[in-house]
Amino acid sequence: MIPTSKGKNTKTQPPLSRMTRDELEDSLFRLREEHMLVKELFWKQQDEIKRMRTALLRLTASGRGLRAEAAADESSGSPLNGGGTESGGTAPSSTSVPRCPGSSCSSSAWAPLLPAAPSLASTRDTDSSTPPGHRAEKPKRESRDRLSYTAPPTFKEHVTNEKARGEVASEPSELGHLMTSDTMQVEEPPKSPEKMWSKDENFAQRSSLESTQKATELRASIKENIQLIRLKKLLHERNTSLAVTKAQLTEVQAAYETLLHKNQGILGAAHNALLSQVNELRAELKEESKKAVSLKSQMEDVSILQITLKEFQERVEDLEKERKLLNDNYDKLLESMLDSSNQPQWSHELGEQLQQKVSQLQDQLDVEMKEKREILLQLSQEKAQNKDLELEVTSLLQKHKQEVEDLQNISTFSQSPDRQSAPATHPALFQETIQIQPCEPKNQEEKKLSQMLSELQVSHAETTLELEKTRDMLILQRKINVCYQEELEAMMTKADNENKDHEAKLERLNQLLDLKNKRINQLEEQLKDVAYGTRQLPLCLKPLPAHENEDKVDISPWHQSENLFELHIHQAFLTSAALAQAGDTQPTTFCTYSFYDFETHCTPLVVGPQPLYDFTSQYVVEIDSLFLHYLQGASAQLDLHQAIASEHHTLAAGWICFDRVLETVERVHGSATLTGTGGEVFGVLEYWMRLRFPIRSSLQAYNKRKKAQAYLAANVLGAWEAQKDEPRSGTWKNQNELRVEIIRCCGLRSRSLGAQPSPYVMYRFFTFSDHDTTIIPASSNPYFRDLARFPVLVTSDLDQYLRREALSVYVFDDEDSEPGSYLGRVQVPLLPLAQNKSIQGDFNLTDPVGEPNGSVQVHLDWGSCYLPPENFPKPEAQSEEDTRDGLETSIEEEEASFPPQDQMVSIDTPTEAGQYQAKRKPPQVGERKEREHQVAGYSRRKHGRKTGLQGKNRMEYLSHNLLNGNTLQQVKYIEWKFSGLKISADHVLKNQQKEEEMTSSYSAQILKETPHPVNDKEFCEQASEGSEAQTTDSDEIVTPVSQKCPKADSEKMCIEIVSLAFYPEAEVMCDENVEQVYVEYRFYDLPLSETETPVSLRKPRAGEEIYFHFSKVIDLDPVEQKERRQFLFTMLIGEDPEQGHLKFTVVSDPIEEEKKECQEVGYAYLELWPMLVSGRDILEQDLDIVGPEDQATPIGKLKVSLQAAAALQAIYKEMTEDLCS
């Protein structure tokens, strides 16, 4: 009956998916109203049935009484017979009366008999007037006529079984017929009392059996009808919910289609953008190639310029020769200039004529010069003769005067006194006569001499005039020569400038060409690495065969690294247990499943115990390592749901594994067992899956694409790279720049077999931050070409660092998630740098086990010539005030001119250069007490689509290996050191600073420095403050500012907590309350906040070791920290409660969410007396950890280091001497 009803509903009912919401609501309200009407009609008919039943019982009782009276009258009115008849006639009535209420105890049981109840009532009403033959058919006819009116028209289609409906309607008619026949038999006159008695008994028995049988059949039919009505109502409700579900499904499908179209549009736009980017990159490559060609052409032009430069040099030499000719022929040029002043401008012909004239004038000038020389010689001779004549004349005059004087003297002695007047006059006359007599020849000679003198004067005047003319000519020639010389110098200067410009341009072009060649080589190497360095996975996949009936898929917009994964859900076979659980032999089911990171897919609804879904999901995936790991190890859950109207519930679930799809490119068929919630098997689901394209080529294309993107990101080349750095100011002569270039690595092997590493290089130079290169994905021979520049001040500390230390270069694998692991490590010695030599070559890498693992090519060189600090010239001594002023001025100039010492410039990755710059200021005199510790944190980088994996080994490595005895434990270098500055003797402090190290082969090295001239007390205060606050842990390195008053080994001690591990059999490993632990120790007056590890680490697993790397430097100054020294002495001699050992306590630290107190887990003891006896520091010694209760059984080991041998010996010696004295 149910399938027929369902089929009828399917034909007449309109499709619910096409009905609107308003129509559905109207139909719902209409059905609700019809339901209320039917319910009211049902209660009315039930009340009517009750009334009819009471009337029927009364009529039955009255009919039997009438039959009994009639029988008594006919049998002669015997009281015995009448009593027997009455008792016999009422017996069936008494048995049937209580049965009738029992059959109608439930109101719902009479609901199917509603059409028959009025017919019974009408039969009883017409008992007395209607003949028996007609009474049997009237109820049946009326029941059939009223059957179609007992329910609303909507439910007519649900009544499909006419036979069952006729039986239900005919049963009351037969009952009425039996009752009328009984009445007819009662009305017949009995013939005899015994016969009537037997007939009554037979009739009562027969009627009771028949009534019992009829009542049973009626009850069964009523139950079936009730069940039928319930099923129809349930079917109607499920149809309604199914319609709602279909409507929702259509809405979801429409939304999914719109979202799919939108996503496809977005993917298309993204693909177009990628294509445009590729085109742009190609265009840029073409432009770069054009630039390279242009540079080559420029190089050819440069060669031409070199030829022209040589020609220009030859011209300069010719000009030098011409200059010499001009100096030799200045007279000719003078005359030519004088003659050319009255002539028009020179031409080529006039130039030749003038040259001829100049040559003639030069000849004339030579002749005149010869004549002038002869005249000058004659003039000199005549002057000499004239001088001789003058000497002769002067000598003659003197001789003549002498003779005259002699004569006068003689005359005076010969004359007498009386005759004195006469002789006095006589000599005068005599003298005149004497004078007159020789004057005549003398006058003649004088005339000759005067005549010769006049002639000589005339010739001398002429010569002087000629000489003045010559001098003027020479002066003019000098001026002309000066003009020519200035012009020549200007031309030479211009030529030199042009030559320098050409040389600078040539050098610039050479630099650009070298840079371009380097860039081309880098791109070639990277292209080779991308094209040939990406290995294929060892997957043996055959090419996909062509299927004729296969859906065509458009793969034009896909990338080479993408693939199409298909998952087909074929058919499910449900067991009888599943059908029983579903409660239906024809259940409506569908499947849901999700794959990778895509959305959940749903199959269509299918009806039947063996639903055939035939549904295929297609996923466009990118073949990478994550997807391969998913296919190899993951499985997807498939849920089987049963749909009931608008609701559904999960019937069973199964799992689909994808590992076999990697073995072939054909369809991989499989079956999943469907299990219920209780674990019972509900059936089997068949499916198949495949990859449309070979996975090996897709994975290789993905690795190539990823590697190319990494190279493109690393090869950002700024315009400033080609510019040559301008020379810095010469304020400080001891500044330099170190260039460290990581070129490439070769032959790297990953720790995972069959995989390629994603390497990057990391190193630290001097006091600078850690520098790391870019990450090259999936490459065994990465080409980095990473250049970092470190500006430094050449000090004694730097020189000692270069001579004693080596540059530790580490190569990490970004794909390796194990903490503390690296691919390779190498120590590059820096001694050649201290000798002003460069370092270049391939260095072999060794893994943590010590096995070789490839090589790294590095190049280190100086930007300028390196001079050791002792070779720098020292300025002269100055006064105290001048020195202080000069120091302040030089510090300010240094701040303005010299960049910070820890600044690094990365050439190939300028965008990341700022990540490793730490802001440092030069120390000022008034701010030395305000210095704080600088914390250098190691940051991680992210690459590709993964988050949190890229660069994660750096912090873990530095907490595991970098500080674990392989490199510098703590760096204490001075930022600003003025080693070449000599100040007055009162303010110069010569101290030594010890550089503390924790290495496997040696303990400490001493570095020299020349600090600033500041008060010793301030230095010591700052040193004590800095030493007490120096701590390191597993994630940080605390680097204090340099101490200006470094402590000696005998004035400090360093305690380091390295690592912690528990034994697997220890009770603490099973204690769930212990989740995090830290380590502490007590030392005299130090608070626990300074002697406990700053962070709590999770409890180590079995066989695992956790690293703290917490160090503490304790000041043991003999003057300021006497109590601490006394405390250590009491520990050594055994008077302290600690009994000569240092006690470490391992404490459990509860999680913040749990409000619990810390509890002590174990203790470790470090003996001090053996260190005092041996005189050696303890480096990473394992101490047994014992429990707080059982002090005999170790539960783990604690690795610590203690540098206090020198301090303990000094304290013991000092205290024993004090005790003895």
UniProtKB/Swiss-Prot annotation:
Boundaries of every C2 domain copy: 723-843
GO CC terms for this protein?
Answer: photoreceptor connecting cilium
- List the subcellular locations: Cell projection, Cilium
Q: What residue spans carry the Polar residues bias annotation?
A: 1-15, 88-97, 903-914
Establish whether keyword Cell inner membrane is in the entry. no
Region of interest called Disordered, as start-end residue ranges on this chain: 1-22, 68-107, 119-196, 869-947
User: Keywords for this entry?
Assistant: Cell projection, Cilium, Coiled coil, Sensory transduction, Vision
Please, which domain of life does this record's source organism belong to? Eukaryota
* Gene3D superfamilies linked to this entry: C2 domain (2.60.40.150)
The cross-references to InterPro entries, in alphabetical order and at most eight, read:
C2-C2_1, C2_dom, C2_domain_sf, RPGRIP1_C, RPGRIP1_fam
Stretches of the chain forming a coiled coil according to its record? 267-533
Query: What's one GO BP annotation on this UniProt entry?
Result: non-motile cilium assembly
User: For the region Interaction with RPGR, what residue ranges are annotated?
Assistant: 1027-1216
Provide the tissue specificity: Retina, brain, skeletal muscle and kidney. Colocalizes with RGPR in the outer segment of rod photoreceptors and cone outer segments.
Cite the SUPFAM superfamilies for this sequence.
C2 domain (Calcium/lipid-binding domain, CaLB)
Where does it primarily localize? other
Q: Quote the biased-composition stretches of kind Basic and acidic residues, using this chain's numbering.
A: 134-147, 155-168
Q: Which SMART domains match?
A: C2 (SM00239)
Function (record text): May function as scaffolding protein. Required for normal location of RPGR at the connecting cilium of photoreceptor cells. Required for normal disk morphogenesis and disk organization in the outer segment of photoreceptor cells and for survival of photoreceptor cells.
Domain comment as written in the entry: The C2 domain does not bind calcium ions, and does not bind phosphoinositides.
Q: To which protein family does this belong?
A: Belongs to the RPGRIP1 family.
Q: How does it assemble?
A: Forms homodimers and elongated homopolymers. Interacts with NPHP4. Interacts with NEK4. Interacts with RPGR. Interacts with SPATA7. Interacts with CEP290/NPHP6; mediating the association between RPGR and CEP290/NPHP6.
Q: What is this protein called?
A: X-linked retinitis pigmentosa GTPase regulator-interacting protein 1
Q: Which organism is it from?
A: Bos taurus (Bovine)
**Classification of source organism:** Eukaryota, Metazoa, Chordata, Craniata, Vertebrata
In the UniProt record, the gene name given for this protein reads RPGRIP1
